[in-house]
Curated annotation (Swiss-Prot):
Residue stretches making up the DRBM domain: 155-225
Protein name according to UniProt: Ribonuclease 3
RNase III domain segment(s): 6-128
Catalytic residues (positions): 45, 117
Presence of keyword RNA-binding: yes
Subcellular location: Cytoplasm
Amino acid sequence: MNPILTNRLQKKLGYTFQQHDLLLQALTHRSASSKHNERLEFLGDSILSYVIANALYQRFPRVDEGDMSRMRATLVRGNTLAEMAREFELGECLRLGPGELKSGGFRRESILADTVEALIGGVFLDSDIRTVEKLILDWYRSRLDEISPGDKQKDPKTRLQEYLQGRHLPLPTYQVVQVRGEAHDQEFTIHCQVSGLAQPVVGNGSSRRKAEQAAAEQALKLLELE
């Protein structure tokens, strides 16, 4: 691993690892090594959920559980994490196997998002819960400042369905058109047919549900609702 890249990444993250092997493991996809980042990802996912839930609870004392759940889902969903990964220029530091490199895995949203969670898990093991909580809140400062309760936090499929129902239009249809990769690391491609759009909208994700949500989000953008 190029030390120039990892040093630059740590500056962007705002954290320097004491145990460098944890950083390397967090950046390692299962296609590259048996010592990959999935256990760190599991840990980081839980820590991220706790930190964001606690931040929302403190910021919005009058907001009900449903709205807080929707806001948390918006903040921790895959495309938000992938967007953050691109801000960190994380793709250049990923350790991928030859197949993933060839297929552009360093750009794949699911891999980028999973790696952010793995880094959170790695930082926790390298330090403590207070340190990783402060770091996550630093990463999320602008997003937490911008987010607010309300319909905007409903997931894209729900918002698309409500939009169409409100206009007495047929509900969207979702069709799996491609599944790539092995069982542990698949990428689904979905076509979403929406009344009012001439062509099916395409969505990709690491599960059918995520791909459908991605397609619905694209449809909302085309309908100028996003």
